[in-house]
Structure formats: structure tokens, C-alpha cells
A protein has these predicted regions:
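PRPP-associated nucleotide enzymes
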Residues: 1-185
Length: 185
């Protein structure tokens, strides 16, 4: 361990403490000057809680995204490059406007680009065309199809995948291409 940096794990200690009012701040406890940062954030992790007005609250995707921005602000101007790994893309289901609706995913990606993020890595984006909101920034959409199939075959006993006993159903239009792939293998 040197300068708060753990060379065994490459993890840097950071936190987003909350004040009694619910406001938060981002705090990086190690030097990051000249480093490539990979910030991992799970916006769907509802098990994290914080106290506000003596009441415990579960963190929402909006809370997680605010904490991500706080950590990016704490790192800005010091890190060589900032990469965000977001397995579930924040606002990913709000990628297309119908009537008077917000485009949360596109706005969030543009906000991260403005803050100096170099690259976003996500898994199975609801609609990968959301990358069009940030054409000059890196956007890697990793498709975990093989891993899903491998896990399914190794954990479900007596899984029968014959045409008569197995059906792949798409929950919505965004998952149609992925499920067509699953049905074809």
C-alpha cells in the first residue's frame, strides 16, 4: 500500500458520505494523479441505504448516478482518463421519446461526457443506439449472451431445449434481437 493505493487489488478507497439533510459529497482517499480510473457503479443496487432525517432510505438509480458524478468531480483534473463501468445503463429504458417524455439516458451520457468521462462500458444496453447521443465518446456495449447461456445450462437441471419444449419470449422490442439470437442457437 503506497499513497492509499493498494497494488494487490488496484482498488482506490473512496466514499460518498451523506449529511443529515440527505446531501452527499464524493471523497477519494488516495492519490489518482495520472492514473486511468475505472469507476464501477451498479445503479440497480437497492440494498445500499443512507440515513436522512433519522430515516433509512434505499438508494435509487438517481441517487447512485448523483454519487457517480460526485466521484467524477472529485477526480476531475487529476486522473489521466476516467472510464465508467455501468452494468445496467442508467436511464436505459428511457432512450426514445414518445410524446412529452424525458430522455434520461441520452442526457446522462452527455452529462458524463461533459464531465470528462472518456469511455462507458455497459452490458446489454436496452437500445445500443443511445450511443448516438455521445458520438465522440467511447461506448462499449458488451453482450453477455454466451455467459447467460452457460449459466442457464449449468444451473437449470433437466433443461430441455427442443423446439417442442422450449420457447424464448422477448419482454419488449428492445430485447427482440437478443432473444432471436438465443432462439437460433
Amino acid at each position: 500500500r503506497e499513497g492509499g493505493f493498494n497494488y494487490d487489488t488496484f482498488l482506490i478507497e473512496c466514499e460518498c458520505p451523506r449529511f443529515a439533510s440527505g446531501d452527499g459529497k464524493g471523497l477519494i482517499k488516495s492519490t489518482i494523479r495520472g492514473k486511468d480510473l475505472f469507476i464501477l457503479i451498479d445503479v440497480g443496487n437497492y440494498s445500499i441505504q443512507y440515513k436522512m432525517f433519522d430515516t433509512m432510505n434505499c438508494m435509487s438509480p438517481d441517487d447512485h448516478f448523483q454519487d457517480l458524478k460526485r466521484i467524477i468531480q472529485a477526480a476531475s483534473g487529476k486522473a489521466h482518463r476516467i472510464n465508467v463501468i455501468m452494468p445496467i445503463l442508467y436511464g436505459g429504458r428511457q432512450h426514445r421519446r414518445n410524446y412529452r417524455e424525458s430522455l434520461d439516458c441520452a442526457c446522462a451520457l452527455q452529462e458524463l461526457e461533459t464531465m470528462g468521462v472518456s469511455n462507458i462500458i455497459t452490458f446489454d444496453a436496452h437500445d445500443p443506439r443511445v450511443h448516438n447521443a455521445i458520438p465522440l465518446m467511447g461506448f462499449d456495449n458488451v453482450m453477455p449472451s454466451y455467459q447467460v447461456l452457460k449459466a442457464m445450462f449449468s444451473t437449470i437441471e433437466n433443461l430441455k431445449t427442443t423446439q417442442d419444449e422450449f420457447m424464448v419470449i422477448s419482454p419488449d422490442e428492445g430485447a427482440l434481437n437478443r432473444n432471436m439470437y438465443y432462439a437460433s442457437v
